[in-house]
A protein has these predicted regions:
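Metalloprotease/metallohydrolase-associated module, dominated by Zn2+-dependent proteases
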Residues: 11, 22-69, 76, 82, ...
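Short pre-active-site segment immediately N-terminal to the catalytic Zn-binding motif
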Residues: 73-91
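Active-site recognition of the HExxH zinc-binding catalytic motif
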Residues: 90-103
C-alpha cells in the first residue's frame, strides 16, 4: 500500500511509501488522524491488501472514496484530512471494506450490498473489540451500524453530533442549536 498526501496546492500527490511498510512520514500522517493506539490495527488491515491511500483536502460531498484498479494503477482510497480521528478510522474501514469487496467479487457485488456490509461490519467489530474508543463512540457506532435502521436515522445523526461536539475545530452548526426565530443566511 502507499500513503500519499496532496501537496499544499492540492494539484500534485506526494508519495510517502509504495512498499509493504509505511515510511516514518507515512506513519506520522496516519497517526495524526487516527485515534490514539489504533495505528497497529490499521497496519494489520493494510498488510492484507495492496492499496494506495490519499489524504485529501476537505470535501463537502464525501468523507472518502474507493477507486478500483484501472489500467496499471493500483486501487486507491481517498479520505478527507479534516475528519475527527474516530470518523477518519470509520471512513478508512468503510473504504477498505469496498477494496476487500472488490478484490473478492469484482463488479458482481453492489458497492453497499450484502457482501460489503459483511466486510464493513467485520472491520467495525475489530475497532469495537480493540477497546481503543471512548464508550460514547462505541455505543454510537453500535447503534448506528449494527441495528436494522437506515444510516440516515437519528442514531447515526447522534454519532455525527459526537464528532462535531468532540472536534473544537469543527465550524458545523446544527439546526437544533439555532434559537427559534433566529435569522441566518
Amino acid at each position: 500500500y502507499c500513503l500519499s498526501k496532496k501537496s499544499m496546492s492540492y494539484h500534485k500527490y506526494q508519495k510517502i511509501n509504495s512498499l509493504s511498510m509505511l515510511s516514518a512520514e507515512g506513519l506520522r500522517l496516519l497517526n495524526e488522524r487516527l485515534p490514539a493506539g489504533s495505528d497497529l490495527l490499521v497496519l494489520e488491515w493494510l498488510e492484507r491488501i495492496q492499496i494506495n491511500i490519499l489524504i485529501t483536502r476537505p470535501r463537502n460531498s464525501k468523507l472518502g472514496d474507493f477507486r478500483p484498479p484501472h489500467k496499471n494503477r493500483p486501487p486507491r482510497i481517498s479520505i478527507n484530512s479534516d475528519l475527527h480521528p474516530v470518523e477518519f478510522l470509520i471512513t478508512l474501514a468503510h473504504e477498505l471494506a469496498h477494496a476487500v469487496n472488490w478484490n473478492k467479487h469484482g463488479r458482481s457485488a453492489k458497492p453497499h450490498g450484502i457482501e460489503w456490509k459483511y466486510e464493513f461490519r467485520g472491520l467495525l467489530l475489530q475497532i469495537l473489540e480493540s477497546g481503543l474508543l471512548e464508550t460514547k463512540f462505541e455505543e454510537a457506532i453500535k447503534a448506528c451500524y449494527f441495528k436494522r435502521e437506515s444510516l440516515a436515522s437519528s442514531t447515526c445523526r447522534n454519532l455525527r453530533r459526537l464528532f462535531d461536539i468532540d472536534n473544537p475545530a469543527s465550524d458545523n452548526v446544527r439546526l437544533e442549536d439555532i434559537p427559534v426565530g433566529s435569522v441566518f443566511l
